[in-house]
């Protein structure tokens, strides 16, 4: 029996893991991986129902901090390998630039995947992306959600090119 429309519980799938095509998907270790898993969930759900689905960017926002912590460790290790001494503030600043790049890549992945997906029932997924800043608790997670929303809106405004590159 086919379902019509759903609010995808991405938060549960991302925080607790999920199963896609008989494969256990663990909690993502980065924002971009969380975005990829989200698009896989969208594809699977769209292939087994008719009607739209809604996802919330607030469910992806906590993974910005996961990436931030990982990138801080990586920057620190890189600097130590090159015998470059930086303050924590400098390391955080470099890591934050990389966080922004990762947000850009993750959002771009969602954009391209949702636009180009074709489901097994022959239709493109109809996806509503919820961008409600109040859904995240005040503090770093809300600030991260604001960055994700800003990037999503900027990419939507820029649009994507068609097959002719226009």
Q: Whereabouts are the PLM-identified features?
A:
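Catalytic alpha/beta active-site cores
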Residues: 1-166
């Amino acid at each position: 029996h086919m379902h019509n429309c759903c609010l995808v519980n991405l938060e549960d799938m991302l925080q607790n893991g999920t199963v896609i095509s008989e494969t256990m998907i663990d909690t993502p270790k980065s924002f971009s991986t969380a975005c990829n898993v989200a698009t896989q969930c969208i594809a699977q759900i769209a292939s087994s129902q008719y009607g739209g689905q809604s996802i919330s960017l607030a469910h992806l926002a906590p993974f910005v901090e996961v990436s931030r912590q990982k990138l801080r460790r990586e920057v620190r290790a890189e600097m130590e390998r090159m015998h470059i001494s930086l303050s924590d503030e400098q390391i955080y600043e470099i890591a934050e630039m990389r966080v922004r790049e990762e947000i850009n890549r993750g959002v771009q992945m969602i954009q391209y995947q949702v636009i180009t997906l074709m489901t097994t029932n022959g239709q493109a997924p109809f996806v509503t992306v919820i961008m409600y800043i109040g859904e995240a608790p005040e503090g770093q997670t809300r600030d991260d959600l604001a960055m994700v929303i800003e990037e999503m809106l900027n990419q939507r405004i820029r649009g994507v090119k068609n097959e002719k590159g226009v």
